[in-house]
Amino acid sequence: FAGHGDTMELPGGGEMGYLIPVDGSTNDLYLSSIGMAELRNLALMSKAKHVLYLVDACYGGLAAVGTRGLIPTETNNYIDKISKNKARQIITAGGKGEKVLEKSELGHSVFTVNLRRGLQEGNADVNSDGYITGNELAMYLEEKVTNDSENMQTPHYGRMTSDEGEIIFVSS
């Protein structure tokens, strides 16, 4: 998804993030936008083993759970294990109150440019093992987007379930 995001404060405390489509309205988020709870439900209903949402929008209320995955250096056959387990992951371009930075000289947003560099050029293969995991991609984007946007936006990453799998890309 590339577009806008917004956050609505909930009456009972907390907040809910929304993705706003081109015909959506910030004055009517619930009826005209896609709530993160709905996005999470779609991920849970999917029969796919691995789901990664890449959201080129900034908002709060990330639909993630606070679990940690397996640790590569401490897990035998790490790639084998994370590829066998289900994964529901999300990476967003930034958080609540931030704006997606578009640079005309780049032709895309800072998030999209770094996403392409990370995957197409293999720059997100942090440990140089020939694979780019969702976690590696998130760490790469967090560093590069934050720097390239001059601290105006910082990508957020999370898991939508407690599953320990990860999306995996083969590095070129």
Protein language model annotation of sequence segments:
Residues 1-172:
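Cysteine endopeptidase catalytic domains of the caspase/legumain-like
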